[in-house]
Amino acid sequence: MAQKRIDPKGLDLKERVVNINRVAKVVKGGKRLKFSAIVVVGDENGHVGAGHGKAAEIPDAIRKAIEDAKKHLIEVPIVGTTIPHEAIGDFGASKVLIKPAPEGTGVIAGGAVRAVCELAGIKDIRTKSLGSNNPANVVHATIEALKQLRRPEEVARIRGKTLEEILK
């Protein structure tokens, strides 16, 4: 299913740098150093995106990552303060399990997953990061898990049932 593009101009986006890494390209004369940045942006109201940027200077890498993240925004269905149901996201060797939690639980998540959940506006959630803990893959796996979420009304419509049948 194709994701509809979300216009970042109408949103009050906050950004959070998840990881900055120094990377090198080995050339004949030695090593060419650059910086790689992973940034998560979100409006804390159901929209979140992640981006990657690379440049010779750290601020430029962060700026590029923010631009990339704004191009890859997704909408997250939030029910009350949590998510509608469990989901598992896979990306590379990383796997992220996200589960709804009762109000007052808070965001129980590790570094990269926490950044995505908080900027998406999820207040109560339990997560478990499995496999690789590479920040780039964990962020993308979390986004994949959030993409799988469906509102109860949407599930009822797809299955051709009433909302009451789905919620019981």
UniProtKB/Swiss-Prot annotation:
MF term (GO), any: rRNA binding
Pfam family, one: Ribosomal_S5_C
S5 DRBM domain segment(s): 13-76
One Gene Ontology CC term in the entry: small ribosomal subunit
Gene Ontology biological process terms in this record: translation
The name this protein goes by in its record: Small ribosomal subunit protein uS5
Keywords: Ribonucleoprotein, Ribosomal protein, RNA-binding, rRNA-binding
Similarity field: Belongs to the universal ribosomal protein uS5 family.
Biological classification of the source: Bacteria, Bacillati, Bacillota, Bacillota incertae sedis, Caldicellulosiruptorales
Function: With S4 and S12 plays an important role in translational accuracy.
UniProt keyword Ribosomal protein, yes or no: yes
Statement: the UniProt record of this protein carries the keyword Ligase: no
Domain characteristics, as noted in the entry: The N-terminal domain interacts with the head of the 30S subunit; the C-terminal domain interacts with the body and contacts protein S4. The interaction surface between S4 and S5 is involved in control of translational fidelity.
PANTHER family for this protein: MITOCHONDRIAL RIBOSOMAL PROTEIN S5
Gene3D superfamilies membership: 3.30.160.20, 3.30.230.10
Organism superkingdom: Bacteria
Subunit structure: Part of the 30S ribosomal subunit. Contacts proteins S4 and S8.
SUPFAM superfamilies: dsRNA-binding domain-like, Ribosomal protein S5 domain 2-like
